[in-house]
Amino acid sequence: MNTIKTRFGVIDYDPANLLLFPNGLVGLPHLRNFIVMPNKKEGPLFWIQSVDDPDMAFVLTDPNNFFPDYQIQPGKDEHTTLGISGSDEYFILSVVTVPADQKITLNLAAPIIFTPTNNRAVQVILGGDGYSTKTPLPTVKRHERRSVVNE
């Protein structure tokens, strides 16, 4: 077991269980090794904590929780980087931003493709798909509550 001091406190982790980004993250190629933080609350969000830079952590989610039609297929380069074949399981994740105004956004323009087969991930930049790095969460309309009176 190794130990790292982070914003979450001191964390013990097994290097064999690290999430590996062989190419790092977009704009942060030096960040390659992450701990997936246990989710303390129910919900679709979770943290990944960088082992390479203890000051860096990111919130991730499955974008299909909010955008059911969002579909990304890994290309040949991603298959090679992830070390997977066409039949291996993979998941699409998005980086979540929670600004001071609490208007949460998802980065749909640069999704993360994750494979549990070997605990590897790659962040890709989509071109020409019309996705944004700051896609607001869809608004949920509140239904009026109506009371029914039995006579």
From Swiss-Prot:
Its main location: cytoplasm. The keyword Nucleotidyltransferase does not apply. GO terms for biological process: bacterial-type flagellum assembly; regulation of translation. Gene3D superfamilies: BH3618-like. It is found in: Cytoplasm. It holds the Pfam family FliW. InterPro entries: Flagellar_assembly_factor_FliW (IPR003775), Flagellar_assmbl_FliW_dom_sf (IPR024046). GO terms for cellular component: cytoplasm. Keywords: Bacterial flagellum biogenesis, Chaperone, Cytoplasm, Translation regulation. Interacts with translational regulator CsrA and flagellin(s). Acts as an anti-CsrA protein, binds CsrA and prevents it from repressing translation of its target genes, one of which is flagellin. Binds to flagellin and participates in the assembly of the flagellum. PANTHER family: FLAGELLAR ASSEMBLY FACTOR FLIW (PTHR39190:SF1). Belongs to the FliW family. HAMAP family: FliW. This is Flagellar assembly factor FliW 2. The lineage of its organism: Bacteria, Pseudomonadati, Thermodesulfobacteriota, Desulfobulbia, Desulfobulbales.
